[in-house]
Amino acid sequence: MKRFYFDLAGALTACDRMGHQCASRREAKEHARFIAHRIAAVRPPFAQPGNYIRVRDENGVEIFEIPIHVGPGYSMRQVA
């Protein structure tokens, strides 16, 4: 299992220092979607354009971003 890091980025930032082990990039995407959905549900003011979860791999390389927004479906911007 590889460790991925899920940072809060945008108007308010927070760096994930512990990370989370995932079996694959696909699983990391699902975990990032879960985090984004949870933040939007618990803290609706954070669900704004420009706020997202930035996912980094074990080497600190950004691999994709998941927007934090309210509503069905999620989009994803591939970085690497």
Specify the residue positions occupied by each region the protein language model found:
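Short aromatic-glycine-(Arg/Gly/Cys) micro-motifs in beta-strand/loop hairpins
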Residues: M1-D16
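A short, charged, amphipathic alpha-helix used as a generic interaction element across diverse proteins
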Residues: S24-P44
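A short, exposed loop/beta-hairpin motif centered on an aromatic-Gly-Thr core
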Residues: A14-R25
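A structural detector for beta-sheet-dominated domains
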Residues: A9, A23, H69-G71
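C-terminal structural segments of small proteins and small subunits
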Residues: P44-P45, G50-A80
